[in-house]
Regions:
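Leucine-biased recognition of intrinsically disordered, low-complexity hydrophobic segments
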Residues: 5-6
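Nuclease catalytic cores that cleave nucleic-acid phosphodiester bonds
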Residues: 112, 117-262
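Domain-level signal for Mg2+-assisted phosphodiester chemistry and nucleotide/NA-binding surfaces
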Residues: 9-154, 170, 214-228
Length: 262
């Protein structure tokens, strides 16, 4: 009881009002991390989560971001105005549809659209063994140009083995929100009086809107993990961009069973 009262007394001085008992306990344990975030959220702040970019971070991190806990955590900061969540919905896929329904129930400002299913040919029956025509749909041009003929022939032979098994196409899921997020950030600056912008993504496509906000003296922070921030965004640190490593807040936002013990 004494511990909880102490936490509450500290909270009153700050902008952090924990929404759950777990957050209260973690606040008491990691006050410096909360203070760092309060400095980022020091004025009216909007958060933009590019979930298609964020979800794969689990492989690198070794732990998963739990949307419900993330929402509770961010809601605990008084200056957070809205938390916008961008993610595609795969029509007819129960898991995808239920996930998005759950996100809406958590109270996020949800932005979604149908995931496009692209069928890409891997049929090499009509091209020479050393042709890059099929591979160019899967390998970026700068890298493809550096591959030796032997490498191209090897990869085409691998595709040929798939063809022998009756596989001539693969499906690629596409649903990009770069344009929508960049647009919304600029609209929120121009019309909604937002002072601070927090982007959960390390994608290079956000470099232009982030640069514009920084040039207009707005505070912008990218929340990401090590080596998941593009070179284009990283270069904007010299312009005032702040990069926050989400590893610092693991226990606040991860699955309960993945919490670190100290």
């Amino acid at each position: 009881m004494t511990r909880i009262l102490l936490v509450k007394s500290i909270v009153k001085i700050n902008m952090f009002d924990p929404k759950t008992q777990r957050l209260k306990d973690l606040f008491f344990k990691y006050p410096d991390r909360i203070q760092e975030l309060e400095n980022i959220f020091n004025k009216k702040t909007n958060v933009y989560i590019d979930y298609a970019n964020v979800k794969p971070w689990a492989t690198k991190l070794g732990w998963h971001i739990e949307p419900k806990r993330l929402k509770q955590f961010l809601d605990s900061f008084d200056n957070i105005n809205v938390i916008k969540f961008y993610n595609g919905t795969l029509s007819g896929d129960i898991e995808s549809e239920e996930f998005m329904q759950g996100v809406k129930k958590f109270g996020f400002d949800v932005h979604t659209k149908p995931v496009k299913i692209m069928r890409l040919s891997i049929d090499v029956s009509s091209i020479p063994p050393n042709s890059p025509d099929i591979l160019k749909d899967f390998i970026r041009k700068p890298l493809l140009q550096k591959l030796k003929i032997e490498a191209i022939e090897f990869l085409n032979n691998q595709l040929k083995q798939f063809n022998k098994q009756g596989v001539f196409f693969i499906e690629d899921l596409k649903c990009n929100f770069d344009v929508e997020i960049g647009r919304d950030m600029l609209i929120d600056y121009d019309k909604n009086g937002i002072d601070n912008f927090v982007l959960w993504s390390g994608d290079s496509d956000f470099a232009d809107p982030v640069r514009q906000l920084l040039n207009d003296s707005k505070k912008v922070a990218v929340f990401a993990t090590a080596r998941r921030v593009s070179t284009e965004l990283g270069e904007l640190v010299n312009n005032g961009l702040f990069i926050f490593d989400i590893q610092k807040i693991r226990n606040f936002i991860c699955w309960k069973k993945e919490m670190e013990s100290e």
